[in-house]
A protein has these predicted regions:
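Nudix hydrolase/Nudix homology domain
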Residues: 73-76, 81-83, 124-134, 141, ...
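Acidic pyrophosphate-coordinating catalytic loop
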Residues: 2-9, 21, 43-46, 121-144
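Short loop segments at secondary-structure junctions
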Residues: 21-23, 57-60, 69, 151-155, ...
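Acidic, metal-coordinating catalytic segment for phosphate/diphosphate chemistry
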Residues: 3-54, 59
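Conserved Nudix-box catalytic region and its N-terminal flanking loop in Nudix hydrolases
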Residues: 41-54, 59-100, 104, 108, ...
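Conserved active-site beta-strand-loop modules that form the wall/rim of enzyme catalytic pockets
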Residues: 62-63, 111-113, 144-150
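Conserved hydrophobic/aromatic beta-strand scaffold that supports enzyme active sites
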Residues: 13-15, 54, 65, 147-149, ...
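Short conserved catalytic/interaction loops centered on acidic-Pro-aromatic/His motifs
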Residues: 108-118, 137-141, 157-161
Length: 220
């Protein structure tokens, strides 16, 4: 495999060439190879890792979500607090990135943070030291994301709010009930990493008894 950087700004585009055995290999041409070029996209500044975190407020039975500008379709869309894991800013623990994004985008701190990927990987023993678990964002993207749930965070104190990135100028934060969250998840307006984070969070909340099965199914 060979790879070079074709373009780099906020994201990087990699020109990757991969060599495969020919699909028409026979004993007579066993050494025949084919080379295929791919465009690969990723965010090297964050080590190709990001987080998505869904805040749940048990007293009001609500969830905090965001509405922000989605540049690819030039329209607004719904997300949960989401952002890159930058080791120089957050340290090696990816949970710190989830806490920071929740502070910056939702103005929430504290609560019980749950890494929804822990013990999910069947290949955990195959990982190299420092390699993070996570879902691959898309087949042509190097980024992986780790979903988190935060139960009962509190409003951040005045003056302690994290600073939004300049491109997040239009971000709005609001709360929704379970019925509205599920509607947004399957309406086409929510980003896929956020949908996965919401579904895994709801599964966790039901299994842990924080949301009853009747409450979950009654919201459909």
């Amino acid at each position: 495999m060979q790879e070079t950087v074709a373009y780099k700004r906020y994201l990087a585009v990699y020109d990757r060439t991969v060599e495969f055995s020919s699909p028409t290999t026979t004993p007579a041409n066993a050494e025949e190879k084919i080379s295929i070029k791919y465009d690969i996209v990723g965010h090297p500044r964050s080590g190709f890792r990001f987080v998505a975190v869904l805040p749940f407020h048990s007293e009001t039975r609500e969830f905090t979500v965001c509405r922000e500008y989605i540049q690819s379709v030039n329209a607004s869309g719904v997300t949960v607090p989401t952002g890159g894991h930058e080791p120089e800013k957050h340290g090696e623990d990816i949970a710190n990135a989830a806490k920071a994004e929740m502070n910056e985008e939702a103005k929430l701190v504290g609560g019980r943070l749950v890494n929804l990927m822990e013990k999910k990987s069947e290949n955990e023993g195959d990982r190299e030291v420092g390699e993070e678990e996570g879902f691959i964002e898309t087949k042509w993207c190097r980024n992986k994301f780790v979903p988190f749930l935060c139960v009962d965070p509190k409003d951040v104190e005045e003056g302690q709010e994290g600073k939004l990135d300049v491109e997040e100028f239009a971000l709005e934060t609001f709360r929704v009930d379970l019925k509205e969250l599920k509607r947004m998840m399957y309406s086409g307006e929510m980003m896929l990493p956020s949908i996965i984070t919401c579904q895994m969070s709801l599964d966790y909340l039901v299994k842990s008894g924080l949301i009853s099965k009747d409450e979950y199914h009654g919201s459909s």
